């Protein structure tokens, strides 16, 4: 099967192992001396980096938050771009994308714990469904400005990206939307605690 060639297996391993790198945790420990795994939401994502570091150094918190978003997004983007360079199939690219997000959310370096996948999902979506990702990003920015709730804004942006992709990229070039839905499901699943707090009106404003 072309899907399981030696070259593709290398890409799958790279996608998961690079996706597993907890950049938020590394940046917060290195530059702010804090362990975000034991504070705030205990997530390794940019929102928790911002939340925790902001308590002692607001200006540094913004810089580290931005750096975390960029690095987490690049975890997915770079492996996909290398895969495109080597001419792997669309099926393989989507498998790489799913594994990169899984790596971030269930990091092998953190005992299969991790972040919530938003930035890494953004990184893979922008390569594979760019127009829909831009639509989702616009929705996220508008909601963030109005609602000032990171989790809700991220989820609304994700939903907008997926719905628009159904019309713009239906089939994803592989006659199936399943990989896109799977990435969205992983991100939504990791946000269940946030969704529960939103329903109860207890979700804090971070943005």
UniProtKB/Swiss-Prot annotation:
**Locations listed in the record:** Cell inner membrane
Instruction: Write out the GO cellular component annotations.
Output: plasma membrane
Q: Which controlled-vocabulary keywords does the entry list?
A: Cell inner membrane, Cell membrane, Lipid biosynthesis, Lipid metabolism, Membrane, Phospholipid biosynthesis, Phospholipid metabolism, Transferase, Transmembrane, Transmembrane helix
Family matches, as Pfam families: G3P_acyltransf
In the UniProt record, does the keyword Signal occur?
no
* Protein EC: 2.3.1.275
This protein's pathway reads: Lipid metabolism; phospholipid metabolism
A GO term, aspect molecular function: acyl-phosphate glycerol-3-phosphate acyltransferase activity
State the Gene Ontology BP annotations: phospholipid biosynthetic process
Q: Which PANTHER family match?
A: GLYCEROL-3-PHOSPHATE ACYLTRANSFERASE-RELATED (PTHR30309:SF0), INNER MEMBRANE PROTEIN YGIH (PTHR30309)
Describe its partners and assembly state: Probably interacts with PlsX.
Task: Report the protein name in the record.
Answer: Glycerol-3-phosphate acyltransferase
Which source organism does the UniProt entry give?
Aliarcobacter butzleri (strain RM4018)
Q: Which gene encodes it?
A: plsY
């Amino acid at each position: 099967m072309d899907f399981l060639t030696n070259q593709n297996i290398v890409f799958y391993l790279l996608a998961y192992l690079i996706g597993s790198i907890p950049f938020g945790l590394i940046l917060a420990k290195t530059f702010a001396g804090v362990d975000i795994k034991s504070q705030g939401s205990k997530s390794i994502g940019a929102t928790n980096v911002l939340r925790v570091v902001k308590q002692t150094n607001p200006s540094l918190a913004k810089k580290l938050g931005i750096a975390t978003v960029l690095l987490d997004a690049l975890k997915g983007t770079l492996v996909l771009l290398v895969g495109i360079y080597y001419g792997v199939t669309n099926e393989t690219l989507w498998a790489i994308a799913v594994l990169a997000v899984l790596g971030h959310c269930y990091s092998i370096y953190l005992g299969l714990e991790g972040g919530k996948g938003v930035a890494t999902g953004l990184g893979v979506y922008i390569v594979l469904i760019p127009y829909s990702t831009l639509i989702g990003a616009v929705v996220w920015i508008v909601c963030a400005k109005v609602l000032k709730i990171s989790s809700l804004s991220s989820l609304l942006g994700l939903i907008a990206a997926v719905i628009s992709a159904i019309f713009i990229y239906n089939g994803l070039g592989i006659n199936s939307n399943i990989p896109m839905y799977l990435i969205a499901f992983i991100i939504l699943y990791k946000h269940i605690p946030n969704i529960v707090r939103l329903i109860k009106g207890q979700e804090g404003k971070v943005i």
